[in-house]
A protein has these predicted regions:
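Conserved SAM-binding strand-loop segment of SAM-dependent methyltransferases
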Residues: 127-139
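Class I S-adenosyl-L-methionine-dependent methyltransferase module
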Residues: 54, 58-129
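A short glycine-rich, Lys/Arg-flanked "PGG" loop and its adjoining helix->strand segment in the class I
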Residues: 165-180
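Class I SAM-dependent methyltransferase Rossmann-like catalytic core
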Residues: 1-36, 47-55, 67-78, 83
Length: 238
């Protein structure tokens, strides 16, 4: 099993992904999201919310990181990118580089994404409107608030740190803030050990008893070894 471990991580990392990565990860159709309300959970320093807003998508982001000010995050972000690339390079043979081509280009994409986020976050009005200092399994958002809820590189991936009860509460919370008829999408479905999150079938069975339907859909950014699918949870319409 250890040979499948594709990344070493202590604590929860700060992410710095861009809009196109989200489009590919979750197979999004940006034009269909115009005017829709979208929540990015565990967004970190990703630029999805900034770019989505420019595309007339009502995007919001939630992460405990936002308890910090812009200058604090800026220092942490650049350090995190360097650590991430160094650890990734050690096991570069395990990844699918079709999109990123190699660590050097990936680093440049991360830096550009972080700069885009930082510029948006540094604007006081934008920061207050779009970025909530919050973490699962309890969010400050209203029930039935968002058409689409995204959770990237947190649930399941950190399954060695957060147990199944946490995951069940977190998934219920994502569904709570999702509008009836809306969707929750989660990617990837693997732990850092390279295995499908072991308790995922049991979690989905419990949600099914609560009226939630789930399906696996193919991702268009299968960078992590074995990460071919993302999970979609459908909230039943009234």
């Amino acid at each position: 099993m250890e040979t499948k471990r594709f990344y070493e991580q202590t604590g929860v990392a700060m992410t710095c992904r861009n809009f196109e990565e989200y489009v590919r990860m979750f197979d999004l159709e940006p034009e269909k999201l115009r005017g829709k309300r979208v929540l990015d959970i565990g967004a970190g320093a990703s630029a999805f919310t900034a770019e989505a807003s420019r595309r007339e998508i009502e995007a919001r982001a939630a992460d405990p990181l936002y308890a910090m000010g812009p200058s604090e995050i800026e220092g942490l972000g650049l350090e995190e990118i360097d650590r991430f690339i160094a650890k990734l390079t050690e096991r570069r043979h395990m990844y699918n580089w079709d999109f990123y081509e190699g660590p050097e280009l990936l680093k440049e994409l991360r830096k550009k994404s972080f700069a885009d986020f930082a510029a948006d976050y540094a604007n006081p009005a934008s920061r207050e409107e779009k970025y909530a200092a919050a973490s699962l399994p309890e969010l400050p958002h209203s029930e039935d608030e968002f058409d689409l809820v995204l959770c990237s590189h947190f649930l399941f991936l950190y399954g060695e740190q957060f147990g199944p009860e946490f995951h069940l509460r977190a998934m219920r919370e994502l569904l709570r803030v999702c509008k009836p008829g809306g969707e929750v999408r989660i990617y990837p479905l693997l732990t850092f050990g390279g295995e499908l999150y072991p308790q995922l079938p049991e979690l989905l069975a419990e949600l099914a008893r609560e009226g939630v339907t789930a399906e696996y859909r193919p991702t268009r950014l299968a960078f992590i070894p074995g990460s071919r699918d993302y999970l979609t949870l459908h909230k039943v319409a009234d």
